[in-house]
Amino acid sequence: MQVLHVCSELFPLLKTGGLADVLGALPAAQIAEGVDTRVLLPGFPDLRRGVADAKVITRRDTFAGRISLLYGHFNGVGIYLIDAPHLYDRPGSPYHDTNLYAYADNVIRFALLGWVGSEMAAGLDPFWRPDIVHAHDWHAGLTPAYLAARGRPAKSVFTVHNLAYKGMFYAHHMDEIGLPWSMFNMNGLEFNGEISFLKAGLYYADHITAVSPTYAREITEPQFAYGLEGLLKQRHSEGRLSGILNGVDENIWNPAHDLLLASRYTRDTLEEKAENKRQLQIAMGLKVNDKVPLFAVVSRLTSQKGLDLVLEALPGLLEQGGQLALLGAGDPVLQEGFLAAAAEHPGQVGVQIGYHEAFSHRIMGGADVILVPSRFEPCGLTQLYGLKYGTLPLVRRTGGLADTVSDSSLENLADGIASGFVFEDSNAWSLLRAIRRAFVLWSRPSLWRFVQRQAMGMDFSWQVAAKSYRELYQRLL
């Protein structure tokens, strides 16, 4: 079985969000499962530099101008790059300029990605042809549409990582992207009078996956579907929408081997975690004290992530003697709020604005609780890292958070399945009640250790996801 992933980011070469983490790990896990897997990406500068052995395998004239298709390897995975310097050779973000304005030609830049994905199934590389073309998020959303227009030379899967981004462009661009106008209607890629790359993927794919089972259900409901609930309900009823959880790349996130930690540990040597906490308290300007629980946030500071709730609940957390370490950036109002809290409570609140991958490991290794109070969360990786590191996740019951964390209720403790703390309603009172439950468990050290060991024993490896995808592909062929 030959599978081609079509996407716009690849960790560690180019990352703006969780999509890159998925594509940095899933293909290698699929290869280990015996699936011949390759990845197609635009030839962005960081990717060109990272795939150093890439060679030209063909050249084509397209609606987007003259392009070359390159092929090389990165971390043992075959990588195709679309070499079109007039479209992709730009510094900084792959999506917008330095003033944060989306590039005016994004419609062409990402239509080309979908077109090449489709042409791969029709023999663009004469030596390798995919049976399954697996497209990710709106950037690759036109891939299934081009496949449909070509008579479906391969089966297509479209994965929704975040339904909030729809890839919307004016209708007149239909003349520029090589698709028939007959596709521009409600039963096609039209959405609110414009072209939606995301809707194209949802409508034309043979199967849609979301990045968790709960998110796959949620996106059939109006509050999560952004106007696409009708189509998604239909696909769900046809058995063409399902959820497969993302995994954790254990080569990168594993406290037993993590060289970014002051002290490495396993579920059997959890006492070694204490040194990481001490070092984190020092680094964040917190009072060194192993008797108080250290809560942490590693997140974009947005209301989607529920960080306004953390700010509102913070006085209650501090009153009970807890500490907070925060790493993140985003909404200026939230940034100012957390910086003000740090100034008002020195030794109890430590804030670092920005994002540093290495420091996020130190927080995960040193904190006791990781807060993920999202209003919606398609899958979420932060809580999975928390489970892996014995840093108990405190989450809202939504999306992938609901699928991965079991509340430390009396019943779950008795059944041996507790792995963190879960709250229902998206308000500060509900969050604060969960924080109080964390303090209650903290006051019982042997029980806390029991839940840590339970959390660290859970398997969210990419191997599990790779098996699920292979079963899906086999059903389609």
Swiss-Prot record:
- Organism of this sequence: Cronobacter sakazakii (strain ATCC BAA-894)
Which family, according to UniProt?
Belongs to the glycosyltransferase 1 family. Bacterial/plant glycogen synthase subfamily.
Q: Which GO terms describe its molecular function?
A: alpha-1,4-glucan glucosyltransferase (ADP-glucose donor) activity; alpha-1,4-glucan glucosyltransferase (UDP-glucose donor) activity
Q: Which domain of life is it from?
A: Bacteria
Q: Which reaction does it catalyse?
A: [(1->4)-alpha-D-glucosyl](n) + ADP-alpha-D-glucose = [(1->4)-alpha-D-glucosyl](n+1) + ADP + H(+)
GO cellular component: a single term: cytosol
Describe the function of this protein.
Synthesizes alpha-1,4-glucan chains using ADP-glucose.
The entry's keywords:
Glycogen biosynthesis, Glycosyltransferase, Transferase
What does the entry list as the binding residues for ADP-alpha-D-glucose? 15
Q: Please tell me which top-level EC class this enzyme sits in.
A: transferase
Pathway listed for it is: Glycan biosynthesis; glycogen biosynthesis
- Protein name per the record: Glycogen synthase
Q: Quote the EC number.
A: 2.4.1.21
A GO BP entry is: glycogen biosynthetic process
Family annotation (Pfam families): Glyco_transf_5, Glycos_transf_1
HAMAP family cross-referenced by the UniProt entry: Glycogen_synth (MF_00484)
